[in-house]
């Protein structure tokens, strides 16, 4: 074994019928973790159920119930390799209710592939004021996914037929929007693709093909390989937000999540915030292999001693008891940008916050100041209200214990989305946190250390 390739997490985003799952499934089918026999079985099942065109998307539908409904819900983790990287795909679904999933999923991604449907009418629907293309791109940026690739998909559609004009029109429109969001458009490759036929996904299209005649850029895999390697904050203290907690027969309690900063290893004493519970880590596993240490970007399960499943919850944060352990917060100050709220927001507003894997109602207890969203300059102290388009510094108080951090110290734990009325009404970045001291319980194994 040579040096292990670096892991890169991808989130695939885009409007509901852009072809995300088909493109993703095709990638995994060709380059990754699914054996050919399983695919043949899927093909047969899909055909029998009259969903032949969902063949590759089917690859991503692990659950029987999901299959019959024809939509992908679970944020599934799937792997494939290129010459340079080991990619893990977090399949983020595109239906409106799943934006919450997307927020917690996206905070794990190093790179976003934004899949857009090129056919006339479909592209416009995705980018319209209430289309998901816009919202997904904005969320990805705010949640710290700084690298993006746009796949101009469904180029094989009979109304597009690999048209250079349509590709240029769609690319130009996307550039305008991506610039507004904060991306630098020349740095975002726009790759014409067909998730269904596989054209320009894995290799460049030859000159005899309608696309090859005018397109000389990279295929999707080449664009992925050309991404910058993510910088991993290994030297920071451990922060690992829990995504789930399992009880596994014969093993015990196994919290699961992604290491955001620092490292976790067997024998370490860890503290969970906001409860303050401390215990010893027995073992750490990734993809069913025991590890001596896991670092930033690794999705792991770890076994903890003498802890009941009831003591841990999704949204809790695990850290090193001896090195800046995480704590719950009494309140925090955040810079918030209001995206789409129909009315005025006053002090006392209490929407749901999605921060890392936590999902908790928080009150805007004080509107501290209103600012210019581009320059950050102060416009007004203690505004009476804020509305769509405004940026403000706000003091927030959570309705129940939660653990967050300042964005400058621990970026993945310092950004959040504000949800209300089933949509994302605002996004924010945490500037400072007032920590809460708690007397946490310590298990016997932790006390010995």
UniProtKB/Swiss-Prot annotation:
The modification N6,N6-dimethyllysine is found at residue 55. InterPro entries: EFTu-like_2, G_TR_CS, GTP-eEF1A_C, P-loop_NTPase, T_Tr_GTP-bd_dom, TRAFAC_GTPase_members, Transl_B-barrel_sf, Transl_elong_EF1A/Init_IF2_C. It holds the Pfam family GTP_EFTU. Residues 14-21 are annotated as: G1. It is found in: Cytoplasm. Keywords: Cytoplasm, Elongation factor, GTP-binding, Methylation, Nucleotide-binding, Protein biosynthesis. Residues 91-94 are annotated as: G3. The keyword Protein biosynthesis applies. One of its GO terms (molecular function) is GTP binding. Residues 194-196 are annotated as: G5. The modification N6,N6,N6-trimethyllysine is found at residues 79, 187, 310, 400. GTP binds at residues 14-21, 91-95, 153-156. HAMAP family: EF_Tu_A. This is Elongation factor 1-alpha C. The lineage of its organism: Eukaryota, Rhodophyta, Bangiophyceae, Bangiales, Bangiaceae. The gene is TEF-C.
